[in-house]
Amino acid sequence: MKESERFLEKGIYKAFKALGEPTRLKIIKMLSNQGMCVCELSEVLDMLQPRISQHLKILKDAELVVENKEGYFVCYTLNKEGLERLWNDFTLFLEADVTSLPGYEKESSRMSNLSCNEKIKEIKGKLQKEC
């Protein structure tokens, strides 16, 4: 497997999709302060417990939170290792050569041809004349 293919495997897309929903981002913030159970998150966020559970499942599937049994309750905390791995993988993704990333072939080709793209030259020419 190419190094560039790891980005899809490691769940960068899944994690950012999970974080892209406002309620889930709020849950992440709440859990950054302390571990919490569904009933606590439900109270703090003023949402029904089943909805909170759905959000937590998505965050857990994206490896952003972990659950721990505490008696009758399940306590959720941030998955610090998962968040660190996400940050490291995202940094590698940003540093990777776009030509080596699967799914970026068309964009990579267009980027390499920008300097000779007539449409871009025309737009830049008009903007320079206006300034």
What residue spans do the PLM features occupy?
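Alpha-helical residues within the helix-turn-helix
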Residues: 43, 54, 60-61
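C-terminal regulatory/oligomerization modules of transcriptional regulators
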Residues: 1-8, 33, 61, 81-131
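Beta-hairpin "wing" of winged helix-turn-helix
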Residues: 60-70, 77
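N-terminal helix-turn-helix DNA-binding core of bacterial DNA-binding proteins
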Residues: 10-51, 73-83
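Alpha-helical interaction segments
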Residues: 6, 45, 63-67
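Compositionally biased, intrinsically disordered low-complexity segments enriched
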Residues: 36, 51-52, 56-57, 69, ...
